[in-house]
A protein has these predicted regions:
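A glycine-rich beta-to-alpha transition motif near the start of alpha/beta enzyme domains, typified by
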Residues: 1-111, 141, 146-270
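Membrane helix-loop-helix hairpins that form the core translocation module of multi-pass transporters
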Residues: 112-120
Length: 270
């Protein structure tokens, strides 16, 4: 089987975009092969469909939603167009909304891409047992994924495995398509993201996370009841977040940042 693909790097969250037509039922198994370091290697796989006069379609490997892949899809559409700037509509698995994105070429194979994200279905403060101690988390339910955001003072001092075990134990009681842990330091403006996708049974401590950045923006905006605008430093790069609050309600969230592309290639799989 010959697979055409291109590798995107949105702020370090390496993503394989499969450009060939594939059978949906085989996508999880195909993604598992492509993700192996001895094959292509990346943090995630998305299946890209582009048709004239229709939104760009991104189907993630486990049917989850991904903000970084969605904005990268807009950047790829701009790359294909040969233009230097453009607005695009993007549809992604795990999300019922068509998302509006804007992409700008900075240099060859390097773009900035921003996308208006779906608003959380719910944001609530919860207590979770972490190593025998109660800790406050913000549970941010987004289309296709639930993030558990915990504020810390210093990301370098956090025992991420202990926090992940707490989230995993908590989430085991629910049938979630995908869920994540976001350790965020408001002082440092740094975050450590982890995402688990149930369909593919994959856990990644990601280099950056778009939906996790949305979760941080939502938690900050709902906690402070005011607009949020900052750049979050992630293990593999930076993501800009902007949240607008009106009459005490969260009305809009936008994320963005750099996207790099490799060359379009083809691989033959047995």
């Amino acid at each position: 089987m010959d697979i055409r693909y291109i590798k995107a790097d949105p702020s370090g969250n390496t993503t394989i975009f499969v450009l060939s037509q594939t059978v949906p039922a085989r996508r999880s198994a195909l993604a598992a092969k492509l993700l192996r370091p001895d094959c292509i290697g990346a943090e995630q796989v998305g299946y890209l469909t582009m048709a004239q006069d229709k939104p760009i379609r991104v189907d993630m490997m486990g049917g989850e939603f991904c903000g970084n892949a969605s904005r990268s899809a807009a950047a790829y559409a701009l790359l294909c167009s040969g233009k230097t700037e453009g607005d695009y509509a993007v549809s992604c698995s795990g999300c019922d909304h068509v998302l509006q994105a804007h992409a700008v070429q900075r240099e060859k194979n390097k773009y900035d891409a921003y996308i208006e994200m779906p608003l959380p279905l719910a944001v609530e403060a919860i207590l979770m047992d972490v190593g025998g101690m109660p800790s406050r988390f913000f549970r941010v339910s987004l289309p296709g994924i639930v993030h558990f955001v915990h504020f810390i003072d210093d990301t370098a001092l956090a025992d991420r495995e202990v926090f992940w075990q707490a989230v995993q134990d908590y989430a085991a009681e629910e049938a979630l398509e995908a869920y994540g842990l976001i350790l965020f330091s408001p002082r440092q403006l740094q975050m450590i993201p982890a995402v688990y996708v149930t369909a593919t049974d994959t856990l990644y401590w990601e280099n950056s996370c778009g939906s996790g950045s949305v979760a941080v923006a939502a938690a900050l905006a709902c906690m402070g009841k005011k607009d949020v605008s900052c750049t979050i430093h992630q293990p593999g790069g930076t993501i800009d977040i902007m949240a607008h609050v009106e009459d005490g309600q969260l009305r809009r969230i936008v994320i963005g940042g750099p996207v790099l592309f490799g060359k379009e290639q083809q691989i033959t799989l047995a």
